Amino acid sequence: MTSPWTLPVPSTAAPFAPYGVPLASRLMLGSAGYPSPAVLGQALQASGCHVVTVGLRRSLAGGGEQAPIEQVRRLGLHLLPNTAGCRTAREAVALAHMARELYGTDWIKLEVVGDEHTLQPDPWGTLEAATALLRDGFKVFPYCTDDLVACRRLVDAGCQVLMPWGAPIGSGQGLLQVHALRTLRARLPQVPLVVDAGLGAPSQIGRAHV
């Protein structure tokens, strides 16, 4: 179970408010991998997070199980559906529209994977899908690499949040490219960065300093 973590920010930084929605916590949690909805609810309450990601494909594969979604809504948290499993921009756009219909939110964590082994995001497919979704009124949270130029293109397209990986999904290797993440922070100072993959322990976030 991978939990995205935001890069530390100076105490003088503006509040975390993706797409103008103020959030008291910078922590986001995934909704998969818990042994029961009750345990998920306990984890969400203990974490103090305000945003929970959910995979639409996983939900549909499980017969449309709504218990985790009900837990999120009962706690008054923000739901962030994702397009995990998509390999093309077209797939991701279609799944995002399904998620908006099903969950009633225009927030979408955009995932377009370009490599089956590392699950590295496809920068071209991600940009294509982000551009289309932003045009359709979505608030896009793109899963991306730490490449400055690719990230800048996403911001230029209208993305107000970036979710660069720390390491390959599920690897637990922590922040492999701290310099690249610091460069993103320095060159895109107004854009919230949420480290989205590869973290195996909370202590690993301590390697990144702004």
Describe these PLM feature segments:
Residues 24-27, 81, 165-166:
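N-terminal start-of-chain detector that recognizes signal peptides
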Residues 13-18, 32-54, 63-79, 86-207:
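Alpha/beta enzyme core
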Residues 1-30, 67:
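N-terminal amphipathic alpha-helix/helix-capping segment at the start of soluble metabolic enzymes
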Residues 23-27, 50-55:
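Short, basic, glycine/proline-bearing loop/turn elements
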